[in-house]
Amino acid sequence: MGKVTGIAGRFGARYGSSVRKKWKEIMEKRYQDHQCPVCKTTGKVVRIASGVWYCKKCGAKWAGLAYTPY
C-alpha cells in the first residue's frame, strides 16, 4: 500500500518535502468550505482573484487574505 500524498502528489519527488508539505497545507485551507461573512452560508464562497472572495448565494464580494477569505 502506497503513501497518501494528497494534493501535493502531483509534484512527485521534486521541490523537497518541506516545501511540498507547506504548499499542501496552504492549498487544503484554500479549497475547504468557507462561510460567507454576510449570509453565513457555508460552501458557497469562491475565490475570484488573489484576495478577492465572492459568495454565490448572496452575491457579496469582499477582500480577504490570499488563500483564505478572513
UniProtKB/Swiss-Prot annotation:
GO terms for molecular function: large ribosomal subunit rRNA binding; structural constituent of ribosome; zinc ion binding. Zn(2+) binds at C36, C39, C55, C58. Its cofactor is Zn(2+). A zinc finger (C4-type) spans 36-58. GO terms for biological process: translation. Keywords: Metal-binding, Ribonucleoprotein, Ribosomal protein, RNA-binding, rRNA-binding, Zinc, Zinc-finger. Binds 1 zinc ion per subunit. It comes from the Archaea. Transmembrane segments: none annotated. One of its GO terms (cellular component) is ribosome. Gene3D superfamilies: 2.20.25.30. Binds to the 23S rRNA. Belongs to the eukaryotic ribosomal protein eL43 family. Putative zinc-binding subfamily. Part of the 50S ribosomal subunit. This is Large ribosomal subunit protein eL43. It comes from Sulfurisphaera tokodaii (strain DSM 16993 / JCM 10545 / NBRC 100140 / 7) (Sulfolobus tokodaii). The gene is rpl37ae.
